[in-house]
């Protein structure tokens, strides 16, 4: 029997209430939580000793076939769009747009009362629950915040300034307030050569305690194959130094892509500012310069003589959302998510769209590594205690995402931003360090897919025995380097081209080669493991190649989810299939810097690159 629930009176009767739209036979969204449940959640979190930030969130319940006028010129409004699409109608840049006029301001004014009512209601709820540590007065309203009224005014920003004052009068001085700006929004908007620091009146408001940024800037430009620029920076796209370095480097800082064609060809245009020598105003990744400099608007491209109201360094920055989808190459576009019902459905640049929980973890680790290092940022800039990881779901795992007949968005979990069910997993380097420490050993390991839920160690053994099991799973070669063991990612990094005249002359042939029998190459592999999503029951995952060949069965004492198990099985099958072709050659003493795991190519051997698996001296 269900427990009795409290009855609440609302301002809308059941008859008058608007029903959430349907999709695929069920509700498109969950309902808005009741006031009682919000108060109870706040009280429960506070009782656990946690600080609470309340975050009113706008979802767009606009189904397909809505027939609504599309401000962007389409036949109707896009299905279930991002709230950042809300704008004036027609939208800026469209024929007949009221952008830059009093008519645009009037449209914004018509929207604001309903929005204010929602935010003020949650402010009152927070007080009724005994108060909260922080509150956001909105997030990612990019399309509205950038709408210009007459005289280059920004009416929605003005409304946010007023709203912040009204929320402050409700919650009092103890609750911190901010607005969570989109990463493309926080530092201003640029139109037709003009630049406006349009949110500065809000950031400068005495009622706003911090600059909020939903920080989904690209941290990678990774591609498959051998011919891409970032392979010179890292062996794999999972490396923390590569990802953390790209927080203030690369796309959006040093350069940009002027077109989709340029992106495909990796033709990068440098970010410059030839007139005033302020390239940082065009760099959305240059958080430090934005925070530490005065801001001068450039209406019509002409720099104002006087700065905006922003006082450099006056308030900390909160990263109100960080993370990325658990999807192949998620770091290329951390803001992208998969949702088949939504017009926003997509996959990151150059992604296969397959699940990859490891890149999600690595993006979070990179942010924490970067922003918790005091040597890399001015004091007081980014508050390392305000890195909000997106997102943890209150629905119970694994019932969510498994019961898709109850929660239709469960199918999105595999590649989505959810941390639920994944936060306890480890990258291979983390697990390797933990295992080695049990044996008082030192290991240097790189992060390699998949994300691992755990590894069973049974019976007596050495650190090498345990680590070899782990590295077999993740495709790393275990080597010795001084007093440490080293895990070197196989099949990764740039290959060095060797010329035949660089090979050593010995009594044996300069180069010998053995080709494997194609009929012996495995075409199928099954991987036995423990299934994290099914209460750690024994499970198998399969990988199949289109060729004809034998079946390989491999069992490993590891805990994986279904996506990680498929990743591992496919990599193991590729490794078995590639292992038949071998070459052997000798190098002079000047080439002794090679290690197992390094890759080389040789002229006229198109099957390369070849990976060094063994080195013999003498």
Describe each model-derived feature in a short phrase.
Residues 416-618:
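C-terminal extracytoplasmic interaction modules
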Residues 84, 88, 329-430:
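Aromatic-rich peripheral "rim/lid" segments of glycoside hydrolase catalytic domains that contact
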Residues 96-134, 139-337:
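Noncatalytic carbohydrate-binding groove/subsite architecture in carbohydrate-active enzymes
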Residues 2-152, 170-184, 393-407:
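Substrate-binding cleft and catalytic face of glycoside hydrolase catalytic domains
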Residues 3-29, 74-108, 226-282, 328-365, ...:
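A solvent-exposed, charged loop/short amphipathic helix patch at secondary-structure junctions
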Residues 72-98, 156-166, 170, 203-214, ...:
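Acidic, His- and aromatic-enriched active-site or binding-groove loops in soluble protein domains
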Residues 27-30, 109, 150, 353-354, ...:
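Second-shell loop/turn segments in exported
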Residues 28-39, 112-121, 154-165, 192-198, ...:
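Well-ordered, non-membrane alpha-helical segments in soluble/globular domains
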């Amino acid at each position: 029997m269900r427990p009795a629930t409290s009855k609440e009176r609302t301002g809308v009767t059941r008859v008058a209430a608007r029903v959430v739209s349907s999709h695929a036979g069920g509700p498109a969204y969950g309902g808005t939580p009741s006031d009682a449940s919000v108060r109870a959640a706040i009280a429960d979190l506070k009782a656990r000793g946690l600080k609470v930030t309340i975050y009113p969130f706008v979802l767009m319940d606009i189904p397909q076939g809505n027939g609504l006028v599309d401000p962007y010129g389409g036949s109707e409004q896009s299905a279930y769009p991002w709230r950042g699409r809300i704008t004036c109608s027609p939208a800026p840049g469209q024929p007949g747009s009221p952008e830059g006029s009093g008519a645009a301001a009037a449209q914004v004014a018509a929207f604001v009362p309903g929005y204010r009512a929602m935010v003020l209601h949650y402010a009152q709820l927070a007080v009724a629950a005994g108060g909260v540590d922080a509150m956001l007065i909105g997030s990612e309203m990019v399309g509205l915040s950038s709408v210009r009224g007459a005289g280059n005014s920004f009416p929605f920003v003005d409304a946010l300034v007023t709203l912040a004052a009204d929320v402050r009068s409700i919650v009092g001085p103890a609750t911190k307030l901010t607005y969570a700006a989109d990463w493309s929004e926080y530092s201003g908007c640029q139109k037709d050569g003009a630049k406006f620091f349009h949110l500065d009146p809000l950031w400068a408001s005495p009622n706003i305690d911090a600059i909020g940024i939903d920080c989904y800037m690209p941290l990678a430009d990774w591609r498959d194959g051998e011919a891409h620029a970032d392979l010179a920076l890292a062996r794999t796209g999972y490396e923390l130094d590569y990802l953390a370095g790209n927080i203030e480097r690369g796309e959006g800082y040093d350069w940009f892509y002027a077109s989709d064609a340029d992106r495909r060809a990796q033709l990068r245009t440098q970010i410059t500012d030839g007139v005033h020598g302020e390239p940082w105003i065009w760099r959305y990744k240059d958080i430090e310069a934005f925070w530490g400099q005065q801001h001068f608007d450039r209406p019509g491209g002409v720099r104002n003589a006087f700065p905006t109201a922003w006082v450099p360094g006056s308030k900390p920055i909160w990263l109100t959302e960080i993370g990325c989808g658990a999807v192949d190459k998620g770091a290329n576009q951390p803001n992208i998510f998969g949702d088949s019902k939504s017009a926003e459905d997509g996959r990151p640049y150059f992604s296969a769209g397959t699940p990859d929980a490891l890149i999600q973890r690595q993006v979070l680790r990179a942010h924490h590594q970067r922003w918790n290092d005091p040597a890399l940022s001015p004091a007081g800039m980014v508050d390392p205690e305000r890195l909000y990881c997106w997102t943890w779901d209150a629905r119970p795992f694994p019932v969510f995402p498994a019961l898709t007949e109850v929660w239709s968005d469960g199918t999105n979990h595999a590649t989505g931003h959810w941390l639920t069910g994944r936060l306890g997993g480890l990258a291979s380097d983390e697990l390797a360090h933990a295992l080695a420490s049990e044996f008082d050993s030192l290991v240097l390991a790189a992060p390699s897919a998949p994300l691992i839920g755990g590894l069973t160690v049974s019976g007596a053994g050495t650190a090498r025995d345990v680590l070899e099991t782990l590295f077999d799973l993740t495709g790393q070669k275990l080597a010795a380097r001084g007093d440490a063991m080293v895990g070197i990612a196989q099949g990764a990094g740039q290959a060095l081209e060797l010329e035949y005249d660089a090979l050593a002359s010995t009594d044996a042939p300069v180069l010998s080669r053995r080709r494997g029998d194609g009929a012996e190459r495995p075409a199928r592999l099954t991987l036995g493991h423990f299934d994290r999503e099914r209460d750690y029951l024994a499970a198998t995952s399969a990988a199949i190649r289109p060729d004809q060949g034998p079946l390989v069965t491999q069992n490993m004492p590891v805990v994986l989810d279904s996506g990680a198990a498929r990743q591992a099985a496919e990599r193991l099958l590729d490794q078995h299939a590639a292992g038949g072709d071998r070459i052997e050659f000798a190098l002079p003493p000047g080439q002794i810097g090679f290690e197992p795991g390094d890759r080389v190519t040789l002229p006229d051997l198109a099957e390369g690159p070849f990976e060094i698996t063994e080195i013999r001296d003498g």
